[in-house]
């Protein structure tokens, strides 16, 4: 939810979808209609029945921003937000990432270019790794990107979650399908390179597979 006092065409929203599309839309595109109390307005046109919105970001200024996308099969792509054109609320946007067969965009981050940005990756096998996104070369929109997980022939890792790490300290509370809760402190992890698959935080055969997470203050330990 993004509150506002008045709509401003200089402010905008960035939408990132599962099927590999991205767009920017001015805030004024979302002026409430007469039926706003009973009927939701369209924010983006999805390309397929399987498509869904993976991330939304509010951009309040005209500073330089970068986009980082992570695919389910472990590809990462970084490029400038200026490569994404501004379009209306009814549009689907432009291609964000060149996806392999059976792959999809799992999540995306949008952050100020001058900002030091890290990300925490959690795989379906409950492995955790931290990466510094400034180590990625800024390339172009709609490319495939680089692998950020080492591919294994047997039981390969797949990205379940990507969490942007800000200067504010927090804990990641990871929940499994057997209702086991594990706390992860991003500060406990050193920055890894692209070919590292991270370290396991639990045994999925015993504790279940990761299904969701929430963030809490750094002092709210279990």
Positions of PLM-derived features:
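Short, structured "edge-of-domain" segments at secondary-structure transitions
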Residues: 1-222
């Amino acid at each position: 939810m993004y509150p506002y006092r008045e709509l401003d065409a200089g402010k905008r929203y960035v939408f990132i979808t599962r099927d590999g599309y991205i767009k920017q839309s001015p805030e004024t595109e979302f002026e409430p209609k007469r039926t706003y109390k009973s009927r939701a307005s369209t924010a983006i046109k999805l390309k397929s029945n399987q498509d869904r919105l993976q991330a939304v970001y509010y951009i309040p200024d005209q500073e330089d921003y970068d986009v980082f996308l992570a695919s389910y099969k472990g590809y990462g792509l970084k490029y400038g937000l200026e490569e994404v054109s501004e379009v209306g609320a009814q549009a689907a946007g432009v291609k964000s990432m060149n996806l392999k067969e059976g792959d999809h965009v799992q999540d995306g981050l949008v952050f100020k270019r001058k900002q030091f940005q890290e990300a925490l990756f959690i795989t379906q096998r409950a492995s955790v790794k931290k990466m510094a996104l400034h180590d990625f070369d800024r390339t172009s929109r709609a490319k495939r990107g680089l692998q950020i997980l080492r591919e294994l022939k047997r039981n390969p890792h797949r990205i379940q979650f990507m969490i942007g790490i800000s200067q504010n300290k927090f804990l990641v509370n990871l929940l499994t399908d057997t209702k086991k809760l594990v706390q992860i402190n991003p500060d406990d992890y050193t920055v890894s390179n692209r070919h590292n698959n991270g370290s396991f935080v639990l045994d999925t055969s015993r504790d279940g597979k990761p299904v969701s997470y929430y963030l809490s203050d750094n002092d709210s330990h279990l």
